[in-house]
Amino acid sequence: MAVTYEQIRNFMQGYFIGYSEDCQLPDRQHVMDKYYSPDIAFDAGFSGRDFWYRICLSHPTWQDKVEPKRLCIDVENLTVSAMVTATFIERSTGRILQQIGMNAFYSLSVDDRGDLKISRLDVFLESNLEKVQTMMKYLRG
């Protein structure tokens, strides 16, 4: 069965909600198994869903909420380009710590069950050095 534009759009919409709400919570994180392939690769040079999950849990005091602004879906090549805003929110107060724009490029695959999965993620950050440095400060703890 061929993958449709609507399937990819719905998959990505669910993904952004899931990442923002579930991926960074230890008891909810594996809800994201429906989005990430077990061997997902990242442009940062690491791979594997479990490794990515550990990274997502490495900042328990703040939440990373990702909101898509524009999606460009290529059905034929199973790719999605997304302009997103990432907002880092302090969990205890709800205070916004940082917002940064990103362009994310998702390569998708279809697993043995016929389900879409993200198999590769490349992220390109906004070219504001101050925002990038602040983001890295929060990521490093």
For each of these PLM feature ranges, what is it?
Residues 1-30, 34, 38:
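Short, low-complexity N-terminal intrinsically disordered segments enriched in polar/charged residues
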Residues 2, 14, 18, 45-48, ...:
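Residue-identity detector for glycine
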Residues 7, 31, 51, 131-134:
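Exposed alpha-helical structural elements
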Residues 12-19, 36, 52, 56, ...:
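Hydrophobic alpha-helical core bundles mediating ligand binding, dimerization, or RNAP-core interactions
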Residues 25-83:
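A solvent-exposed, acidic/Ser-Thr-rich amphipathic alpha-helical stretch
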Residues 60-141:
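A beta-strand edge to alpha-helix "cap/lid" segment located at domain peripheries
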